[in-house]
Amino acid sequence: MARGPGPLGRPRPDTVAMPKRGKRLKFRAHDACSGRVTVADYANSDPAVVRSGRVKKAVANAVQQEVKSLCGLEASQVPAEEALSGAGEPCDIIDSSDEMDAQEESIHERTVSRKKKSKRHKEELDGAGGEEYPMDIWLLLASYIRPEDIVNFSLICKNAWTVTCTAAFWTRLYRRHYTLDASLPLRLRPESMEKLRCLRACVIRSLYHMYEPFAARISKNPAIPESTPSTLKNSKCLLFWCRKIVGNRQEPMWEFNFKFKKQSPRLKSKCTGGLQPPVQYEDVHTNPDQDCCLLQVTTLNFIFIPIVMGMIFTLFTINVSTDMRHHRVRLVFQDSPVHGGRKLRSEQGVQVILDPVHSVRLFDWWHPQYPFSLRA
């Protein structure tokens, strides 16, 4: 009599032997790579079956190596702890700390090697330095530079900047824009431009007479500025004079002129050193009126002005006059500069009030109406 399947019979070939009670599930690296996936590999697995929420390092490393090999990348490029985040059960296999140490050493060696290559590449680039062209090439190119592009041209390299310091550069620039019908002061005429002293300043002044883009800039200045000029703060008053203007009006007007020396940009930025022109071209770059400007205020009446020469100009306001038809100008002078946005009291310093005012104009040293010495 044949026996049926039962506890006394042999197990069928297609049945799988169940693990004994009390045995834990074991995970091996080759099992993870072969595509076998169990419930313990998922984050939402049953806590009764999987007691730990941490994936074993060996399993993570094995899966990471398998994925990277499929993607054509090296497994050491990504930390193993960030590769997987799932739940796993503690197992009895050997600790993978040695593998992690070896992996970290490999990453460190690759990082050091990469830094050395980057440093070597940077040294090669620094050592190359590009091509250095002779000064004659830059002087030839400078003949095609517009006056408003001189600054950009000088910033290309040191040789280009040196070319803009030469007397030949400024002489050629003057001849290129000079016309016979140009109305120029005596100091800016061709026979006076043979002097090397103040050559650069004289050429710049002449361009505001001859070069149309520069002349158009100064022709747009209104009689009364739209906003109060703020560039004169902490400027030193070098000179003051007034003169009587006789025009079409029945009563003459009075013109009050204040010559100021602006605070040097180097002092504002606390930078004492800067790029200086070559010694042989110092006369070309000499300019007694450098950083100077002229404040010209025209009034309808004569107004007594106290002595302010040598004092520091600290406050400048333009308001509407009391008759609501003209403007009122208030100037405040101090013995020392005012820094840090400190406010002044009304009784401090010397105040100059001009009212009624017909026009207020501010001329830089290159402006055609700026008075400069013929000896410059």
UniProtKB/Swiss-Prot annotation:
Subcellular location: Membrane
SUPFAM superfamilies in UniProt: F-box domain
Membrane topology: Single-pass membrane protein
Record has Transmembrane helix as a keyword: yes
Residue spans crossing the bilayer: 300-320
Annotated stretches, region: Disordered: 1-20, 100-127
Gene Ontology CC, one term: membrane
Keywords carried by this UniProt record: Membrane, Transmembrane, Transmembrane helix
Family: Belongs to the TMEM183 family.
Protein name, per record: Transmembrane protein 183A
